[in-house]
Amino acid sequence: MTLQEAYEQMRRELLSLRRENEKLKNGTYVDAERLAHEKEIRKLKRELARALKDKERYHSLWRECRFWGSDDSRLEILRLSKLLEEANETIKKLKTQMNRNHENSSFPSSQKLFHKKIKNSRVTTNRKPGAQKGHPGHKRPHMEPTVPTIVLPPAQDIISNKDFYPTGKFITKQIADIDIRVSVTEYSAQIYRNRITNERYHAAFPDGLSNEFNYGKNIKALAFLLNNYCNVSIDKTQELIQGITDDKIILSKGLINSLSKQFSDSTVHDRKKIYDMLLLAPSMHADFTPGRVNGKNVQVLICTNPYETLYCFSEHKGHQGIVGTPIEEYLQTLVHDHDITFYNYGGGHQECLAHVLRYLQSAIENEPDLTWHKNMKALMSGLIHECKQERNFSEKRIHEIEEEYDRILSFADSEYCLHPPSKYFPDGFNLFLRMKEYKDSHLLFLKHPDLDYTNNLAERGLRKFKRKFKQAVTFRSNESVALLCDCMSILETRRQQGANLFDTAKLAFIF
């Protein structure tokens, strides 16, 4: 080694020693063994972390396998869980159907077999029923006697007693009854014959007197009303009239059945007048109801207002059932229970709030996690109560009601986002969409004080047809239903106008 090389080696060692000395002074010196240990520690930590992750993963797999078993068992459990969920939803749907009645759906109250006890808000007292002391009496008015008054003689001991004297005052009591008797009027016309032409002649009989024996308008009107208005069967009508006339008048079943056609033919002009008056009314109530003819469904449409009613027969519902009825030409406000067909006619529409309240009640019972329908029912019930007190709403009050209506529907939207509707009970969600889309039709009555907020007028009218249909069970021909509609149109209109129905029926029959 040369002197130059030795010097260079010494210089490098010196520099290395200086650097180590500097590190020792600053406290940054780490020897190689320590570095190796720290590296090993970091490696072991990474391996431990991976081991812990594997432990958790395998433990989770173990628990899953222990709970679910094999893949086949897991698939079977998933399948059964899905079936159980569907079964629970089906049970919920069936319970909903079982609990449907006239209080939470459009079912008529007559279909409920066992009604609840009707609530009575009167306070219970110990007073006897009838007239109360201190209250004005409501006596039956006395009538003009049709026979001489029967004066009751006093007892003989009263007459002979000088302490009693007549006061000139009388106590009168009357018996009102009806006297049923058979009246027979015979018309006789002498026959004349021409000696030359052998022509036969007799005086003309009154119009309608075509048969040798005819029934008068009184007996026809009675039989007609019993069968078509009182819903008495043809057999019972025949039996009743035979009984009250002491077997003197025995109407044939064919005659009783033909009275509706005679009445219909005699009142064509009256029904046309009803048709025209309905078109002039500011609002019209309309509704369909089904019937059956020889096992086949048919429809009856009612068009009514407080003064006129028209029943229309049709084989089908929808647009076909409206053809030829007043609704087809009507341009004012229609009141109905959300039959979409009606929205193609008329100039305005008012939904029946009685139906809406029942649908809201159904949603309350079947969607317990939601609250929007409770708020909406409270709003609608309050509006109806408010309308009964005052129908003229101010613009400010109408604006407040509309804002509350929108707020409830907005809240309903948020609730259905959190609790989506069940496929087995979509009625609540559908009601929400309907009330949102047809807001104006639900609140139209606020701006029109004369507009009714329910369709009860049409419902009551159709209930009379349903009673007749229930008594008849089924009709034999479309003509019989159409004739019944014609007769009910006249009778119901006359009843609304306060006319005497017996006189109305008599006017339709000549004899």
Feature map (PLM): residue ranges:
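Short, flexible loop/hinge motifs at secondary-structure junctions
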Residues: T2-N211, N257, A286
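Catalytic center-proximal scaffold of phosphoryl-transfer enzymes
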Residues: R18, E22-N26, L35-E38, R42-A49, ...
